[in-house]
Amino acid sequence: MSNKKADSKPQAKYPVNLLDTPFPMRGDLPKREPQWVKEWEERGIYEKIRAASAGRPKFILHDGPPYANGDIHLGHAVNKILKDIVVKSRNMAGFDAPYVPGWDCHGMPIEIQIEKQFGKSLPAAEVMSKARAYATEQIEKQKVGFKRLGVLGDWANPYKTMNFVNEAEELRALGKIIEKGYVYRGLKPVNWCFDCGSALAEAEVEYKDRTDPTIDVMFAFAEPEKTAQAFGLPALPRAEGGIVIWTTTPWTIPANQALNLHPEIVYALVDTERGLLIIAEERVEACMTDFKLTGRVVATAPGVKLAGLRFHHPLASAHPGYKRTAPVYLGDYVTTDTGTGVVHSSPAYGIEDFVSCKAHGMTDSDFINPVMGDGRYIESLPLFGGLSIWDANPKIVEALNAAGSLLRSEKYTHSYMHCWRHKTPIIYRATSQWFAGMDVTPRDGGKTLRETALEGVDATAFYPSWGKQRLFSMIANRPDWTLSRQRQWGVPMAFFVHKETGELHPRTLELLEEVAKRVEQSGIEAWQTLDPRELIGDDANLYEKNRDTLDVWFDSGTTHWHVLRGSHKDQLQFPADLYLEGSDQHRGWFHSSLLTASMIDGRAPYKGLLTHGFTVDGEGRKMSKSLGNGIDPHEVANRLGAEIIRLWIASTDYSGELAISEEILKRVTEGYRRIRNTLRFLLANLSDFDFAQHAVPVDEWLEIDRYAVAFSQQLQTELLGHYEKYEFHPVVAKLQTYCSEDLGGFYLDVLKDRLYTSAADSRARRSAQTALYHLTHGLLRVLAPFLSFTAEEAWKVFQPASDTIYTETYYAYPEVAGSAALIEKWALLRDVRGNVTKALEEARTANRIGSSLQAEVAVHASGARYDALTSLGDDLKFVLITSAATVVKVDDEAQESVDVAASKYQKCERCWHYREDVGAHADHPTLCGRCFSNLFENGEIRSAA
């Protein structure tokens, strides 16, 4: 370090060693941080980190790709900064931990943007070229934002799911799971968004409250004799009546094909003013009240006795097109929590209905499926053709009422499925899609996908641990994965499908590889322009190109294949050590990645999963435009500094919600200043210290210096343990305590007298500086993962010849003999010092003393405390920061106390101690004896402090 003193000030008559440093007190972060970002890029710091780490064990944090659309928000900042802390801490722990950022580029949001800008009639080729350009522009914009946050990575060479090599490798991954037998085509109800015009993944569905009409509808008796027999009656008492269902989806009534009862629930035949009604016995009283009817139970029967009975469609009298009957099927999923205990079944629009009807012998061609992809009924549907299902709801209620089938109608607010992009309601809709079968046995005869994935969950470490059960439950209960989408901007499911049978071409695997080669050269556009005859010759007359695209969750879910082992295999490796994302990714990227790796490799693609919560305001409310409580990371970085965002994230327990507000940021800023002031003190007091020239051997250090280094080494061991377990908030909490209490409140406070008043080149002062040198090395490195700009700024002052702190590893402190005993002893001394400080404060309040140096204390101590205090000899006064200190032995702890008296001596002009020998030298009447010695003779001798 430089040897410059603060020579801009006039020299004092009796100078002290007050040094300066180019590391300023004010961080001026908004101004300085962008300069560091620029410098890191220009000087190739990330590449230098990689070079320094070459040959070490690899640690791979695989970046879950954000979507290439829109500005980065606070959630992005949380995610990227947490990743940056992990990567930097692993590099400094001695690993080669590259960070390759990535982006998710295909899919609906970008396609929507292109439609907004250019309309919906663009040719497919133009949609793709404009989508590529748009995604590229968004990536560059987001990249600037991430770099501004101090995140180091391979920004020049990120992975993008739209890069040709990644698109091609994704097709090869598809080929792998087809080869293993997991993929099939079938008709099933899937999540369907009318605005997307496509199936949705489970992760693309969110729930919001919605108000819909709820109706109780009667299906009239079609087989009165059989119904009477089922209830043990010779005949029904009257002909009018039927079975009653309750539904919140009137629009499904036109597609009704069955009724479901629970086999063990008891059903009652109730005589009412509206005829005989069949209702679950335990729901009779509630239903009579709701229907405003009086009723008498005529007979009862368990559901199993009613199986196979048929009832007329409730609109049979309204239009001949509904003159059909619905059979009673049995289903364990029927409950009596609400409604009538009878479920109407439209198998095209409900998973349980679909499964039940399939189990009872219905085939795909039997299903009534009148709702088109845009949410309108087909024109040929009686009474409601061409209507949107939402517009049809009230008209269906009217028609049911006119037909005499409606018993009750009212509004009902419930949690309902919505598209996460459009925020509009979605439905289950039976469509022909490509699926990955969760319970399919692969061709090699191994375990099912579900079994393999659950084993993968068991083998994964979770941070926090509750994530394991959450993901396990999701995998255990999920339906088959709908792989296909009906869009343009996505990786094609590049199949040739037989026009009549719907079967895949027998050479599908070979053909997929041929398509992949073309995609590798010119992107997914190659499939759009491909003439089938190029690949299948005369078979082109029999087969058509499949127009479906892959679910974008397959894009990101196969990055373990097309990134870790594909585009970036030279830097990365499989499996990754860690995936780190928000808690929503248990049903998103964590989930899809697990399924694809289970199919391809029979294992999870990660060794560990780290989950963080979402940001909320200071009152725990989610951030929203309507509440006006959102916080923009750009604005905070430009006003307070990205370092404040980084410190906030690191100091917050990310396993729950991350609360942020102006008040919280204010507290974080105050904490930052304390750390910065500590660094400034360290750097200033090392500014005339050259380790090679001035370092003192460990065994010659003063005792308190040995203690400080031993204590810091012990703390570092704790901190590295936290870093290894990704526990960052304890790291910050302990470092803030270390800076404010262990250093600022104790060690540095004690040290000031020695640093400032001892002879500049004395052993006592150089001992202190040697200890500070080691402490600074250690402190900057454990701060660096989260206080990235500040640690680098301080490092360049501390070690100007070094390129960057980020090529360093955690500090190897010198070994201090007897460190455990030393730490234990000084813990006692600090405890006593606390009692002395309290006594001094009481004396100051009583106006008996001014500063602590005006005091002389007598410490009454027993046992180990007495031994520790007396071992310091005359240096005890320096530890207590008093002008004199004596120790009085007492028998036990009950007798321990502190006596404080004002010194009767003069104050030394230079060191401010009150001493008997002030003025002992006539030429220097305001100096004490030790200051005279330190300035003009050999200097005082200290051993402990």
Swiss-Prot record:
Gene Ontology BP, a term:
isoleucyl-tRNA aminoacylation
Q: Which residues form the signal peptide?
A: none
- Give the Enzyme Commission number: 6.1.1.5
Give the cofactor binding note. Answer: Binds 1 zinc ion per subunit.
Q: What GO cellular-component annotations does this UniProt entry give? A: cytosol
Name the UniProt key words of this record, in alphabetical order.
Aminoacyl-tRNA synthetase, ATP-binding, Cytoplasm, Ligase, Metal-binding, Nucleotide-binding, Protein biosynthesis, Zinc
Superkingdom of the organism of origin = Bacteria
Instruction: Provide the protein's localization.
Output: Cytoplasm
Cofactor or coenzyme needed: Zn(2+)
Q: Which Pfam families match?
A: Anticodon_1, tRNA-synt_1, zf-FPG_IleRS
Instruction: Enumerate the InterPro entries for this protein.
Output: aa-tRNA-synth_I_CS, aa-tRNA-synth_Ia, Anticodon_Ile_BEm, Ile-tRNA-ligase, Ile-tRNA-ligase_type1, Ile-tRNA_ligase, M/V/L/I-tRNA-synth_anticd-bd, Rossmann-like_a/b/a_fold
Membrane-spanning segments: none
Positions contributing to L-isoleucyl-5'-AMP binding? E581
Statement: the UniProt record of this protein carries the keyword Nucleotide-binding: yes
Extent of motif 'KMSKS' region: 622-626
Respond yes or no to whether keyword Ligase is given for this record. Answer: yes
Which reaction does this enzyme catalyse, per its entry? Answer: tRNA(Ile) + L-isoleucine + ATP = L-isoleucyl-tRNA(Ile) + AMP + diphosphate
Gene Ontology molecular function, alphabetical: aminoacyl-tRNA deacylase activity; ATP binding; isoleucine-tRNA ligase activity; tRNA binding; zinc ion binding
Binding-site residues for ATP, renumbered to this chain: K625
The residues listed in the UniProt record as binding Zn(2+), with positions renumbered to this chain, are: C908, C911, C928, C931
What the protein does?
Answer: Catalyzes the attachment of isoleucine to tRNA(Ile). As IleRS can inadvertently accommodate and process structurally similar amino acids such as valine, to avoid such errors it has two additional distinct tRNA(Ile)-dependent editing activities. One activity is designated as 'pretransfer' editing and involves the hydrolysis of activated Val-AMP. The other activity is designated 'posttransfer' editing and involves deacylation of mischarged Val-tRNA(Ile).
Q: Which family does it belong to?
A: Belongs to the class-I aminoacyl-tRNA synthetase family. IleS type 1 subfamily.
Q: Which NCBIfam families match?
A: ileS
- Annotated domain remarks: IleRS has two distinct active sites: one for aminoacylation and one for editing. The misactivated valine is translocated from the active site to the editing site, which sterically excludes the correctly activated isoleucine. The single editing site contains two valyl binding pockets, one specific for each substrate (Val-AMP or Val-tRNA(Ile)).
Q: What is this protein called?
A: Isoleucine--tRNA ligase
Q: Which gene encodes it?
A: ileS
